[in-house]
Amino acid sequence: MREKFLSLFTFGSDYFYLKVALVFIILCKLLTIRQTTQLKFHYNRSNRLMTEFIGRSKITQLVYRPYLLSISPLLQALTYLFSEEMNKYFKPEEFDRETIQLEDGGTVGIDWAYDKGTRNGRPKRTDTKSKPILLLAPGLGGASDNLYTIALLRAARRSGFKIGTMLFRGSQNLPITSGKLSYSGAWRDCKAILEHVRGKYVSSEKRERMYAYGCSLGAQILALYMIREGKRACQVIDGAVLYGTPWSTSKGADFFYKNAFGLYQKGIGIKLSEDIRK
């Protein structure tokens, strides 16, 4: 019986590769089941706002289930990159780009998503209540067509938001017009973008609500903006969400240099070099 079973996986036997693939998929599935965990939340219990949010929402019911082919961080990254490229090819998203000139000569911008089925990009002030505005601050890549940004964009658009992706210096074919590139401390650039949108597209009667969302590096920049501006930020945005905020830049840098044979930092470095050459 044992010999018969082993013969099924003998190199050159019928459907050998199919059998190997089947075993691989089964093993991956078993690992994802093993890695499935209930989310745990660690927060200051004296924070009444967070305590109320935890109590009223269903966020504590969320369960982390790894994707079948993403049983490790590296596999997750590779699967994500493949999915992102497929999304760009088969379901590309178009944008209405608006550029903003900064006081020091630098250039930032906003990629406004078109409303579904229309060519309506940038918001328009109206005499009646209009769509709430949601500005997205992406991560290290800084592009508006990253899959994690696009997925949120589409979900928010279905919920009735006008979506714009903030583009910091040097991002996604923006012209480099000063001697400064974007970095984790670029909160003043974030401030300039938010105040530009507030002044240009939000009426003085505040018929439109305006929110900001930051992911990874974008979350770090947005958080620093709110810390530095304090209550003044509340006059510009009506709310903000930070996701995947890097709490230690030095540890994050070590991760890029030391993990996956340095592939992460090489990829980012190549992309940055290409952007500068353009």
Which residues fall in each region the model found?
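Core residues of folded domains in eukaryotic genome-function proteins
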Residues: 96, 104-108, 130-133, 159-164, ...
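Terminal signal-anchor or tail-anchor transmembrane helices
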Residues: 2-38
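Short, surface-exposed "cap/lid" segments of acyl-processing enzymes
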Residues: 113-177, 196
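Catalytic nucleophile-loop/oxyanion-hole region of alpha/beta-hydrolase
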Residues: 146, 169-211
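Intrinsic disorder
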Residues: 94, 104, 128-131, 143-147, ...
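N-terminal cap/lid segment of alpha/beta-hydrolase-fold proteins
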Residues: 73-127
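Alpha/beta-hydrolase-fold enzymes
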Residues: 27-52, 199-278
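N-terminal topogenic membrane-targeting module
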Residues: 36-74
